[in-house]
């Protein structure tokens, strides 16, 4: 039997249950005689198209490629759901009394203000960790410079 490419496009309207338009491109074998080709066409029309079913939602597809693309969408959904669960789990496991890394405030307090330097002060700048609640009231008042200079 001689196989020469003979493509045909089968179109069918969607039924009321299945709202998908069936556009199936089929490569059918053709033979030398027209009578045998007509018999192969009639037998291929009687054959049921192969149906591929999704394991997750039971949706039906007429090609394995379409099913593969559809299952990739399910894979993406599962990946996003997993990441969301992991993020939620990690945020719940952090102890509320423990600060997050790098959440403490670090501030520079220098004794090198211009007025202080003019009066003979040193340029010693020190970094110290400030508690989350801020400075004590007495410490805050002692570091506050209210002088105005032009």
From Swiss-Prot:
Keyword Secreted: no
Cellular-component GO terms for this entry: nucleus
GO molecular function, one term: DNA-binding transcription factor activity
Annotated tissue distribution: Highly expressed at in the abscission zone (AZ) of petals, stamens, sepals and siliques. Expressed at lower levels in stamens, carpels, cotyledons, major veins of rosette leaves, trichomes of inflorescence leaves and stems.
GO terms (BP aspect): negative regulation of abscisic acid-activated signaling pathway; negative regulation of floral organ abscission; regulation of DNA-templated transcription
PANTHER family assigned: C2H2 AND C2HC ZINC FINGERS SUPERFAMILY PROTEIN, ZINC FINGER PROTEIN 3-LIKE
Record text on subunit structure and interactions: Interacts with DOF4.7.
Function in brief: Probable transcription factor involved in the regulation of floral organ abscission. Participates in processes that directly or indirectly influence shedding of floral organs.
Designated name of the protein: Zinc finger protein 2
Upper taxonomic lineage: Eukaryota, Viridiplantae, Streptophyta, Embryophyta, Tracheophyta
């Amino acid at each position: 039997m001689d196989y020469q490419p003979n493509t045909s496009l089968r179109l069918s309207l969607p039924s009321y249950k299945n709202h998908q338009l069936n556009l199936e491109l089929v490569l059918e074998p053709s033979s030398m005689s027209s009578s045998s080709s007509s018999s192969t066409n009639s037998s291929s029309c009687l054959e049921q198209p192969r149906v591929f079913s999704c394991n997750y939602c039971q949706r039906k597809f007429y090609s394995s490629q379409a099913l593969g693309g559809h299952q990739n969408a399910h894979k993406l959904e599962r990946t996003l759901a997993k990441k969301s669960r992991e993020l939620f789990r990690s945020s719940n496991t952090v102890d509320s009394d423990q600060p997050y890394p790098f959440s403490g405030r670090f501030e520079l307090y220098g004794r090198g203000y211009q007025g202080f330097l003019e009066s003979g002060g040193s340029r010693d700048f020190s970094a110290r960790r400030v508690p989350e609640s801020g400075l004590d009231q007495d410490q805050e008042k002692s570091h506050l410079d209210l002088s105005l200079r032009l």
